[in-house]
Amino acid sequence: MVKTVDFSGRPFHFIGIGGIGMSALAYVLAKRQLPVSGSDLRSTHITERLQGVGAHIFSRQEATNLELFNSSPERVLETVSVAVNGTQPSYPNGNGKTFSDSPSLLLQETLPQVICSTAIAHNNSEYAAAKEKGCPIFHRSDVLAALIRDYQSIAVAGTHGKTTTSSLIGYMLLKADLDPTIIVGGEVDAWEGNARIGAKGGYLVAEADESDGSLTKHYPNIGIVTNIELDHPDHYQTLDDVVKTFQIFETQCDLLIGCLDCETVASELTPAITYSLDPSKGADYTVQNVTSNHKGTFAEVWERGNYLGEIRLTIPGSHNLSNALAAIAVGRKLGLNFAVIADALFTFAGAKRRFEQRGQCNGITFIDDYAHHPSEIEATLSAARSKVDGETISRVVAIFQPHRYSRTATFLKEFATCFKDADLVILTDIYSAGEVNLHNISGQDLAEAVENNHSQVIYEPSLKGLPQVIPDLIKPGDLVLFLGAGNLNQIIPEMINTYHTASTQSTANAMVETSINC
């Protein structure tokens, strides 16, 4: 018998609940007043946010964590209680009764549904215990797939641009007063996190991940494919393998929107609605007269040959203009007025770790970006280069932490040439993300490859060493980008503080700004 995710009141337990994808699902379920618990080895603002909506978080991954919901019904209600207008929540059991009306209902099937991601090994103590106890075990994509079926759903897929595009669409629907539920792979200030709960049965905007093949589980009303490239070589051997995953996804979408600027999308998929930055490609949505300056990116938008109006984006780069076109296509399909769409695009401030400004100090701007694939790095550095004006910004400095041995080895040639828009490249050793180094590759190998194509390359293997090395390498007028999907961004505050200390020792008139800025 095929197991199905149960939203009628049975508890959920997430192994690794603090992950960006897992926490978004846990948040939505908790806000739907379902009992939620989970474990994570690190306490973060993400786990604190989950606790704030009633999730019980364990700091260790142990078999006993699964026994939380085997305690008394009163204990369960106390554990998962959420302040909803100052009242105790009710957990519907699907039969017209609620757990708060009749706590004994909680004793029915109290073994939790256990949710895990691809990162959780099968010898994990909680996973092994869940299997032994007979708990229903689901991959996080199973929960997302069930939610997609539960709403009027918009699923954003693609090798690059998923988080920004899904965040843009979610923000647009929010500005249009459509009260969407949103599940994305990054944090957005507009909803103070990576998820938002909206109207029951209303719109759901979700980021749909292809990295492990689970994209094929989703059946959205509207699907978007931003682009298709070979990535995640730990799962896919060839581009054809990736294409097959997206082709299955296409057949499961009621309507597909695709970007014709990606040759693979244009040749391998048949989207019903198309968009492109190039007017000559005949897409349904395109742009003309594109200009960029310190105030943003400006463009005229055309819909099937008819002029719609002008947009202005504050998030930089042609890749983000493409993401905006995807959002416009969705908005128009849903019947939104173009003025509402344009206002949302202008006021959208971006997602965290997507060209996110983390601070400024003595004429240096520090940027955090999740780019970890050669194409993403190239697009991000191109956006950075567009900001160089010779006055406030004069150089682009790229600090990159490679992510996964398999990706570094597979794309070594592409990594070697993707830093052309950086004036200075600083590389660290590879962030393993739990991989074993079967490729016998190191950050030093990457540094040597980049050095063959770039005159200014520095290799500092240790993250701990970067705050001591970098202050001597940067200067006023630099735009410093921290690139990668690993933990490089964690040293940014220390980096800014170290540079501030060093600069104030040599400059008596150093300017001190608020917050992390100096």
From Swiss-Prot:
Alphabetized NCBIfam families for the sequence: murC
A molecular function (GO) term: UDP-N-acetylmuramate-L-alanine ligase activity
Pathway(s) the chain acts in: Cell wall biogenesis; peptidoglycan biosynthesis
One Gene Ontology cellular component annotation held by this UniProt entry: cytoplasm
Catalytic activity: UDP-N-acetyl-alpha-D-muramate + L-alanine + ATP = UDP-N-acetyl-alpha-D-muramoyl-L-alanine + ADP + phosphate + H(+)
Domain of life: Bacteria
Any matching Pfam family: Mur_ligase
Cellular compartment(s): Cytoplasm
Physiological role: Cell wall formation.
Protein name, entry field: UDP-N-acetylmuramate--L-alanine ligase
InterPro entries assigned to the protein according to its UniProt record, in alphabetical order: Mur-like_cat_sf, Mur_ligase_C, Mur_ligase_C_dom_sf, Mur_ligase_cen, Mur_ligase_N, MurCDEF_pg_biosynth, UDP-N-AcMur_Ala_ligase_MurC
GO biological process, one term: cell wall organization
Chain positions recorded as ATP binding sites: 158-164
EC number, UniProt record: 6.3.2.8
Species in which this protein is naturally found: Crocosphaera subtropica (strain ATCC 51142 / BH68)
Swiss-Prot/TrEMBL keywords: ATP-binding, Cell cycle, Cell division, Cell shape, Cell wall biogenesis/degradation, Cytoplasm, Ligase, Nucleotide-binding, Peptidoglycan synthesis
Statement: the UniProt record of this protein carries the keyword Metal-binding: no
Family classification: Belongs to the MurCDEF family.
